[in-house]
Design a protein with these regions (language model features):
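Sec-dependent N-terminal signal peptides
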Residues: 6-11
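C-terminal motif of bacterial Sec signal peptides marking the signal peptidase cleavage site
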Residues: 15-18
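Positively charged n-region of N-terminal signal peptides that target proteins for export
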Residues: 1-5
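Carbohydrate-active catalytic/glycan-binding domains of CAZyme proteins
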Residues: 21-382
Length: 382
């Protein structure tokens, strides 16, 4: 286990990040960040994201997540699925829809109504990924004649940074696996086993793949839990996706650039049972409208807790600049959505939603991409 000590310069930098001006005049951190202190515990009954796992300042990594036990494979109705971060890959050759999510496994369906699963489709034996309890925000992409599985793993046995008055950051990375068909098995192919595609000392999650002008990029989240004002960043990958060719990630935007995003403490939201101030970035997904406008679906916290937002690129390329919509695309504690087309050519938005006291469940929504901006329609009830 490697402990990176905070220098006086590092602590000062963190304080400056918390207090530095940004594009919104209404933005401020609701609690002063003092070096070396643990974030206050959540109040009894307070809204809380991510459970109540306590963080400390002892220099130890968090307790590891419990490993998920694979449930029995069975066929269930879409409305009975319970999951976060749904991602659907339509496979035209077999007329099969493949659904992945946080947890890392796969379901499959021929009609988007009845889903069979979950199936274990990855082989990570011998990699540090085994020490993670599960893969978060799993996705499947086809590039060339191969299928790629992007998932986020969190190795809680390695501490990469002890952030003052926040929490101890574990080794968080989005890693890529590869297979010859969408059902796997997906195995490591990186230039070296356990290769870090993102900087090792960054808290990174939710990586997704995007192709533009013959180049392949990974777009990912640099977590607000580490840097207070979360960012979206990207790196360029090698043509075979086995390593990163970028010297360093490029930041696309910060959470505070979106007018609809609220600061976690100000909105009354605790995280991991602690009152950590900051602004969230989550779940990037790229899309183009029929007019060629490049957009990114992404999530954060707004007036109604978790929310789905959109940013658009003024240049039509990944380089941006990225302009945020004034209002959330979808609120009501819903987010981490993505777009896919049915085999009949219909565009559908799939997203997870949680009622006040209920679990996260996926939903289908109609959307219209015929103009320069994506327009949300009605929920699809099946």
């Amino acid at each position: 286990m490697r402990l990176l000590a905070f220098s006086i310069i590092g602590i000062t930098s963190l304080l400056l990040i918390a207090c530095k001006p940004n594009t919104r005049s209404d933005v401020k951190v609701s609690e002063i960040i003092k070096a070396g202190e643990q974030a206050p515990y959540a109040d009894p009954g307070q809204k809380n994201f991510g459970g109540f796992q306590r963080r400390d300042t002892t220099g130890k990594a968090q307790a590891p997540r419990p490993k998920f036990q694979m449930p029995e494979v069975k066929t269930v109705h879409f409305n009975d699925l319970i999951m976060s971060d749904p991602f659907i890959y339509p496979h035209g050759e077999t007329q099969t829809y493949y659904l992945t999510c946080s947890g890392g496994w796969m379901y499959k369906s021929s009609d988007l109504e009845m889903w069979t699963g979950p199936y274990a489709i990855i082989d990570i034996k011998g990699l540090w990924l085994e020490r993670a309890g599960f893969a978060a925000a799993a996705e499947i992409h086809k590039i060339g004649d191969k299928y790629y599985y992007a998932g986020t793993w969190s190795d809680h046995s390695e501490l990469i940074e002890q952030v003052p008055r926040r929490y101890n950051v574990p080794h968080n990375q989005t890693y890529l696996l590869r297979a010859d068909n969408p059902e796997g098995p997906y195995t490591s192919f990186a230039i070296e086993p356990g290769y870090d595609y993102q900087p090792h000392d960054w808290d990174c999650i939710d990586g997704t793949l995007y192709e533009e002008n013959g180049k392949i990029y990974m777009i990912f989240v640099h977590e607000w839990t580490q840097i207070i004002d979360g960012t979206m960043d990207y790196i360029e990958l090698a043509p075979d996706l086995s390593y990163t060719v970028s010297e360093k990630p490029i930041t696309m935007f910060r959470a505070t650039e979106a007018p609809w995003v609220t600061e976690m403490n100000a909105s009354g939201e605790a995280t991991f049972g602690l009152k950590m101030p900051g602004w969230v970035t989550d779940g990037p997904q790229m899309f183009r409208t029929q007019t060629g406008k490049l957009g990114m679906l992404w999530s954060s916290w707004g007036k109604e807790r978790y929310a789905q937002g959109i940013a658009y690129s003024e240049s039509g390329t990944i380089a941006g600049p990225w302009v945020q919509e004034e209002e959330a695309f979808m609120a009501n504690n819903s987010g981490h959505g993505m777009l896919f087309k049915t085999f009949e050519g219909k565009l559908i938005f799939v997203v997870h939603h949680a009622s006040e006291n209920g679990p996260r469940k996926p939903q289908y929504w109609n959307v219209d991409d015929s103009g320069d901006k994506l327009v949300l329609g009605t929920q699809i009830n099946i």
